[in-house]
Structures are given as C-alpha cells and as structure tokens.
Design a protein with these regions (language model features):
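Periplasmic-binding protein-like
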Residues: 50, 54-96, 114-117
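Short helices/loops that flank or line small-molecule/ion binding pockets
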Residues: 17-20, 32-47, 51, 59
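Ligand-binding clefts/hinges and TM-proximal coupling segments of bilobed small-molecule sensing domains
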Residues: 10-25, 65-71, 95-117
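Short loop->beta-strand "edge-of-pocket" segments that line small-molecule binding or catalytic clefts
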Residues: 1-8
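Extracytoplasmic/secreted envelope proteins and their assembly/folding machinery
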Residues: 12, 32-35, 39, 50-54, ...
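Short beta-strand-to-loop elements that line the ligand-binding cleft
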Residues: 5, 23-30
Length: 117
C-alpha cells in the first residue's frame, strides 16, 4: 500500500511512526494534493486531518467516492501568548463567555467538530 501525506505534516509523522516504509510514502505539497493522489489512483490512501477529510469527502463533494477511514492520532490546538501577557485573561474571559452562551458549541457543530473541555 502507498500513503499520500502532506510533506512535513503530523500525518507524515504518523505513518513514519507506524513503521511504514519510506518507499510507501508519497509526500505532496498539501492535504488537497494527498486527496488528489488517491482519486487519481496514484496512491492507495492518504493521511490528512479529520476536519479536512470530513469536509472534502463523501456525498456532495468532488471526492464523493472517498470517505474517512481510521483515526491515527488526535491533535488538539490551543491559543498561545507571551508569558505574562495581559491578553491571556481577556481571551480566557471571552472563551468562557462563548462557551457559556453556546457560541463555541455552535461553531463546533457547524464544522462537525467535537468541542474540547
């Protein structure tokens, strides 16, 4: 099997960590190119972010015959600031407000994401 991955991505690291041989890994410019490799038949599978996979595959997309398969890793993202920044408290207040009023959940629902605690 061959796996298309975005060069330098977490997906590439995941397949390397799984022990997939370098000869089976096709590194491409971006995640959209990884999907194109599968659609073109030049790769058996691709490893991309689940958000991208959900948005770009399945019914109503250019890749209607493709679907997300398995999850290899979990990635979480955060917001970072310089140590001691007064912006941290302001952003924390805003995030707490958005969580309480349902704004964050609405965004998560809109983009088929799971809201982290």
């Amino acid at each position: 099997l061959t796996f298309a991955v975005e060069n330098g991505s977490a997906g590439q690291s995941a397949v390397v960590d799984l022990g997939i041989a370098e000869s089976q890994i096709i590194a491409v410019q971006d995640q959209a190119a990884a999907l194109m490799e599968v659609a073109a038949g030049t790769s058996d599978a691709c490893v991309i972010d689940i958000t991208m996979a959900n948005a770009m595959t399945g019914e109503g997309t250019s890749y209607a015959d493709l679907a997300p398969g398995i999850s290899l890793t979990s990635e979480e993202y955060g917001i970072g600031f310089r140590k001691g920044s007064d912006v941290t408290a302001k952003v924390n207040e805003l995030m707490a407000k958005w969580k309480a009023d349902g704004t964050l959940q609405a965004l998560a629902d809109k983009y088929s994401l799971t809201l982290a605690e």
